[in-house]
Amino acid sequence: MKVTKYLPILAVCLMTTGCNSKKEAVLTSGIDLANLDTTAMPGTSFYQYACGGWVKDHPLTDEYSRFGTFDMLRENSREQLKALIAELASKTDNAPGSAAQKVGDLYNIAMDSVKLNQEGVAPIKAELEAIDALKDKKDIYAYIAESQKKGIRPYFTMFVSADDMNSSMNMVQTYQGGIGMGQRDYYLEDDEQTANIRNKYQEHIAKMFQLAGYDEATAQKAVKAVMNIETRLAKAARSQVELRDPHANYNKMDIETLKKNFPTFDWDTYFTISGLKDLKEVNIGQPAAMKEVADVINTVPLEEQKLYLQWGLIDAAASYLSDDFEAQNFDFYSRTMSGKKEMQPRWKRSVSTVDGVLGEVVGQMYVEKYFPAAAKERMVTLVKNLQTSLGERIKGLEWMSEPTKEKALEKLATFHVKIGYPDKWKDYSALEIKNDSYWANIERANQWDYNEMIAKAGKPVDKDEWLMTPQTVNAYYNPTTNEICFPAAILQPPFFDMNADDAMNYGAIGVVIGHEMTHGFDDQGRQYDKDGNLKDWWTEEDAKKFEERAQVMVNFFDSIEVAPGVHANGELTLGENIADHGGLQVSYQAFKNATANAPLETVDGFTPEQRFFLAYANVWAGNIRPEEILRLTKLDPHSLGKWRVDGALPQIGTWYEAFNITEQDPMFVPKDKRVSIW
């Protein structure tokens, strides 16, 4: 899920199949030998062999629970953003209402800890009192709708996005939620670590209520009320694996049917306050969860619901209040749950806020300074090389029939590719940044986001809209638009290196591109057609063969012990593992195509093929705390970095050839037991 900053000369060489790069630049291997641990054996743990030196040289600092090459790029990006933002924040003549004024003022407000500490709980006091004043269930429904506008999401989440069955149109949808720990397992499982986190959460709730000015007795009542409601919501929620099934989470209905299916939910009040009075249809993602929401609202005493709603407000606002709120918030969510030891400095948190609120304003400045426009077209050519490679692989699949191949190739040919930055930027003119409280500005920003979102309901999908900002170090595939997107910030080493040859670049950014393409054909993506509709285009026999091959991947990752007594979740991580697998296969073939007429030489003692796999492994170098391993294993659809290497490569035949891996090596998997899909 990554890409890289690159410059013209290398880009031309990388993207012109068979071009002789030696004529244009003196290139290196791009592999930092210091990253290696040459005492390790490639066939015992390729991750340790390729990344052991990096891991040793980059011990975790207190502000991180996990730190790897992605985080290094994010740190670099954040420094760049700081320079851009701080320059505007230092000016006193920014025109009122201008982008410069909004960026500069929001940063200064976020940095003003003196004012924040003077205010204490004051910025949310009136809202807490308003919750106290709620008189009945109708008021509860009205408050849910109002609070969602401000970025607070009690009970459930409502959003607008493409209709999976009619992907050209946007639709209002609901999604389970309303639980402070975010994942249902924290409420339902009873192992020692989960039980400890649950106990710490209750202590956290009590401390936060007391910081907000409530006495201990009220704080303890709040703990009981919150845990009662959130545990009920958690029991009704779907698991992380169940949420990956697009058909199970598609339950579109007209408003008449909605009211019939959920008769005790006051939809009229909710939709009127939400600004959706004339809504015609909605998708209820998880019906059992929504039924429980209605049951909770109708059966839990009003006073307990008020405490739950007040907790939602306190929890949402904590990061934008005084230091004592921030410290307590960090203590639970970061220290207890993830193992972090120290909060990031205020400037980093402030930059992140400005980036989150005014992402495309900051992104436009970032692109103008750090990403040349010409790079966009060169990247498009590289993507086309990978598309060609994936097409070749699809045509050569022995297990797939011709009718399904034809549909797969049609889908591949219609990929919508986004590189670097959007062609059209968002208009933030309606967003006001004022010199009042930090939280008030965050609420206005959330209201602006909400208004923009609601305006899309029932309207055509804008396929030119970006779901990430240019300064985001990541990449994505969106099934309903059949698009792959590579923001500018990921276009830099170690993902792409202008001074390195094709072996390194195809091993790193090439695999990233192939990874995103393969998402269009993983266990979820394969269920969407070329137009982004949830529609079966597979023959029954081919679908069965795919599922059988995917199960091999599930079983392999289920067998991996990520911590003592804790195994990876092969079903949860299936889509990402298939994408890694496909990315490696597709990019390796593209690499061989690109160098067929001008073979690369051995450099630094490594063949081109070896450098390809070393570059891939180096992308996943990182350190991680035990608490974070356990947390991510519960909720993250991505495998841990180590296993994106040691779990992925044993399935790749060309890796065995490159490093002479044999039956005697611990990582060896017999050929007939390996995953073989794309």
Regions found by a protein language model. Give the residues of each.
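Bacterial N-terminal signal peptides that target proteins for export
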Residues: 1-7
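Short secondary-structure subsegments characteristic of cysteine-rich extracellular domains
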Residues: 12, 63-85, 217-236, 505-511, ...
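C-terminal motif of bacterial Sec signal peptides marking the signal peptidase cleavage site
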Residues: 15-18
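Bacterial signal peptide processing site
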Residues: 20-22
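Active-site-surrounding "flap" and adjacent substrate/cofactor-binding loops of secreted or lumenal enzymes
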Residues: 24, 38-44, 49-114
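Hydrophobic/aromatic-rich, well-ordered segments within soluble, folded domains that form packed cores
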Residues: 35-56, 187, 191-210, 402, ...
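Noncatalytic, helix-rich "gating/capping" subdomain that lines the substrate-entry/channel surface
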Residues: 88-381, 385
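Intrinsically disordered, low-complexity linker/terminal regions across diverse proteins
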Residues: 226, 261-264, 283-287, 344, ...
